[in-house]
């Protein structure tokens, strides 16, 4: 980032960064903003080659000229979240089950729309089936801090059955923290359907 490439340099840059360093990019959200398309992506891969230590999000600001990309600007999207919650969001967007589970305290509880899970193993089973298994991603649209944690409003999409649901689905994630771990996660619809 902070570099400019033109013409054939673009292909060399893209090949070396995205192919040469084993980088994975997962689209999370697309919107029109200030006259151009903004594609938010989660980025994961060879951290040493990328010069980072964990997954991160980028906003790709795309200006089109007809059916071609005239300009692409990449802006790192920083989420102001406590470390365990940020780690959970990043892991969820990469379908990384072990990393998601590691963010929870051993005696944590989770409640996903009136379904209760107690302890890491029960939470792991839920996350394996319904989050990583259904390739669910979340695009954070609002962050509200509360005593003991944070509430996150997010647009959620994935390979789950969307019958009767909006797409993307908006959910609220209420995280309660204990030290550097998630002690409780409650997931509810942002509004009734």
Task: Please annotate each region the language model reported.
Residues 30-32, 74, 110, 143-145, ...:
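Hydrophobic/anchoring residues in structured secondary elements
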Residues 1, 8, 94-107, 111:
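Short, well-ordered alpha-helical segments enriched in acidic and aromatic residues
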Residues 78-95, 103:
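Short, aromatic-enriched amphipathic alpha-helices that serve as compact interaction elements
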Residues 11, 97-101, 120, 124:
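An amphipathic alpha-helix signature
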Residues 57-79, 170-193:
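Short beta-strand edge/turn micro-motifs at domain boundaries
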Residues 10-52, 57, 61, 125-165:
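Surface-exposed, charged secondary-structure patches
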Residues 43-45, 76, 104, 156-158, ...:
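Short beta-strand segments enriched in hydrophobic/aromatic residues
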């Amino acid at each position: 980032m902070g570099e400019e490439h033109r013409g054939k340099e673009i292909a060399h840059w893209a090949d070396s960064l995205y192919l040469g360093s084993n980088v994975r990019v997962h689209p999370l959200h697309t919107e029109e903003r200030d006259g151009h398309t903004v594609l938010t992506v989660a980025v994961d891969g060879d951290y040493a080659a990328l010069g980072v230590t964990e997954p991160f999000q980028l906003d790709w600001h795309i200006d089109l000229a007809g059916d071609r990309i005239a300009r692409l600007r990449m802006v790192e999207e920083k989420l102001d979240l406590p470390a365990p919650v940020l780690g959970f969001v990043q892991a969820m967007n990469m379908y990384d089950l072990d990393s998601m589970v590691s963010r929870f305290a051993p005696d944590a509880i989770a409640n996903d729309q009136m379904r209760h899970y107690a302890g890491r193993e029960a939470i792991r089973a839920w996350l394996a089936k319904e989050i990583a298994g259904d390739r669910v991603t979340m695009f954070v649209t609002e962050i509200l801090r509360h005593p003991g944690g944070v509430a996150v409003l997010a647009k959620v999409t994935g390979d789950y059955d969307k019958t009767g649901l909006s797409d993307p689905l908006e959910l609220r994630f209420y995280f309660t923290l204990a030290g550097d771990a998630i002690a409780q996660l409650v997931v509810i619809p942002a509004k009734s359907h």
